[in-house]
Amino acid sequence: MPTTLRSLTLLAALAAALPAAAAEIVPPIDERFAAELTAAAEQPDFRRHVVPLLGRLGCNGRACHGSFQGQGGFMLSLFGYDFKADHANLMGGDEPRTNLAEPAKSLILAKPLEEVDHDGGKRLDRGSWQHRVLLEWISQGAEPAAVAAASFERLELEPQEILATKPGDSWQLKAVAVWSDGTREDVTPLCRFQSNDDQVATIDETGLVTAAGPGDTHVVTFYDNGVVPVPVLFPVSTLASGSYPDVPTPTRIDELVVAKLRKLGIVPSDLCTDAEFLRRVALDLTGTLPTAAEVEAFMADPRPDKRDRKLDTLLASPGYAAWWATKFCDWTGNNLDRNQNNGPDNRPVATAAWYEWLRSRIAANLPYDEIVEGIVLARSRLDDESYEAYCERMSDYQQADFAQAFAAQPYLPYYWSRRSFQTPQERALGFAYTFLGVRIQCAECHKHPFDQWTKDDFARFQNFFTRVRHGESPDSKQEITAMLERLGVDPALRGNDRDKAVVKLLKEGSTVPYRETFVVAPPKPAPVRPAKGKGKEQPRKPEKILVGRTATVLGGDEQQIDKLGDPREVLMDWMRDEENPYFARAIVNRVWAAYFNVGIVEPPDDLSLANPPSNEALLDHLAEEFRQHNFDLKWLHRTIISSRTYQTSWHTTDTNRLDERNFSRAVPRRIPAEVALDAIRMATAADADAGTMAASADGRAVAEATAVGWGQSGKYALAVFGRSARESNCDCDRSMEPSLLQTVFLQNDRDMLAQIERQGGWVEAVSSPYEAAKVEADRAAVGKARTAERLVAQAKRRLEKLKERGVEGKALAQAEAALAAARRTAPGDQPPAVSPAASPAAAPAPADVARIVRQAYLRTLSRPPTEAEASRATSYFSETASVREAARDLLWALLNTKEFLVNH
């Protein structure tokens, strides 16, 4: 019987009497090869059976022959994605793994049987079904995967959800592969399995799931290009069995969250207090600490809809657009060190313009897809704009406020001009991270271990970016040369030297040349021309820059791009398509993660099949509604924040103490670096200055500035608190973890202490009515002491230099005398003396002390003190020498509490 017919005999017999849509499931291969084989045995299929079996045995894993260099002179593609290469490696080489003449002596059998030396140990038992499958495949010719064979469509799993009741409960997964010819085969014995949390459920190599402990996770099944997760839920209490309490669900978000909590027996926390809500939403939405006056007013407001009103106010505030523009800068990679000098618009200018371009659109509530379109389709020139007109426009921007003027143009070309974003590979990786929330790095070299992407998928996807260029476009080189000649720029100058000359001319008001982001024309067929001295026509040599004629969106069909002016248009259309599985989900998940400490998919930038959502119905709902509301970002923020789920307390119930992924309570989390610095500055500022900061984003760290109020120490402080480095395609560039260095900074850093004691700050404002003269005297004494310390340091350095040079005699004696004199004027360990003329400080009334204490709590923790806290703080004031000292110490102590640095 011919091998192609023999291999289909079993499948045809099972499906002959049934329509394709109702084809029976082919029994698993371990049953079909359980007994001794006969002459009529089916031929195992290389793609459907042999390669998955090698994966199941561990042969093509990363620790074995699937590593990038193989093992023992034999290599397989990682997890078996390259069927052609795998077949060639099995059949060829100096030591073929298959022996068609004597199949039983094939190395692919002998080594895993350990009949010959094998570093991987024993993987097969003689006579097992696995042994029979491989032996039969070789015996029948070791055929490769047929080019015209049916393609893999999907993997179906049963059960689709597992609900455990006690440890030790078990379930057998059943995996069915569905092929394009209608074949449905039970491939459970050929699958690989993993549990995402062994503390909740384990899964063995046969697909047997066993409950381990309370919680929820997924078990994931891998076969061919299929990756399918199955949720496992193990209730944490008996409430899941029918005694679950009546929990309010005023919004659809709440309904979907509580639906899962009910299965887990988790009761959500109560609503947070008004003070907690105000602090939480102000920090989350605007990156701004509420002022003391704002907290007082909100708590006193009797209107039942005051939370919704406050939300609307915050969405209209400058802080909202500033803070979320900074987040978008994180995701799009606005990195000062990696932006290129584009000629006159240097890196700092480009960085500020990038931020302002995003901020202005977020403030105007431009739909998210339109913001993205301005980035994805970005080029430097406007429609039908000549190169000279482009240079005139950019030069005019420089004469005004460049960032403001630049923000008015429709595109953001700086996204494409970054130094770390120039190759098609870099762009494919960065694009997938920024707009799709997908990590495809693995697929650059091999099959993604936790997703469907292959190396071929990556190569086809990167073709969308091969024609995007940054620099001098081919059609503008002559104009650039002519412009430089008119300007009198030395033609011998290159690079930075030429840029310096151009910048000088720009400052004088001249129109100067600019580099640009552009898209090269699609490739043309090579023209035919006669060869010299011959009568035959020869095609021209291809251009040096080769560009792809086709490209493929992730998980989609191949697209013809050689006739498109800009291949990126296909990507934009695909992302807007309502069937796109990534675009809306990625931004919805990132916004959700900003509010709940974790995403519905966590990490938020890893939307892979093996990393499924903790609540898929919730993510699907939000993504679909976001699309239906025309990608309205303010709608998204308002919808999430208005939910009861967002407004739950951080105080736990008996059932949700350990829950951090199902949104049953607010999870306290450290505030981001920029927010922390602004909060410190606002908390230490006088009331008027704090109000100004709250009403404006100017000079704020959340506004992409360098923390103006912190002077030169701003960058260091931002680094201490984990500001995003924007160096890689990973949300992990921003650190939200607490550290010892942060504690040291808050307690002892010179600039931190200077914020508390600064002139015009809150401490001075509340203490000055009681000790104005004393403050001036103390300030003078401190200034005198610092001058003396500086003189001592100078004298010591001079003396040390003289000794190093070997100077002796009179000069050395004079230096020693100068040092001694300076030391006599230094304060040493004694406190600075206060002028006798200074009037004594007036004692504040008890009501004044209570007011100061209350204000300190409101401006730092956004709540009044408890009775115990107020009593303790008031007592400290009575025990301390001055109001200034007591207020300073109280403010310092509050800034060093966990409650201040945590959003809850």
Please describe what each predicted stretch is.
Residues P245-G319, W324, D330-G699, D731-R734, ...:
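Primarily short, surface-exposed interaction patches in extracytoplasmic proteins
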Residues M1-S7:
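Positively charged n-region of N-terminal signal peptides that target proteins for export
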Residues D45-R62, W129-W137, R427-A443, L890:
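Sequence/structural segment immediately N-terminal to covalent heme-attachment motifs in c-type
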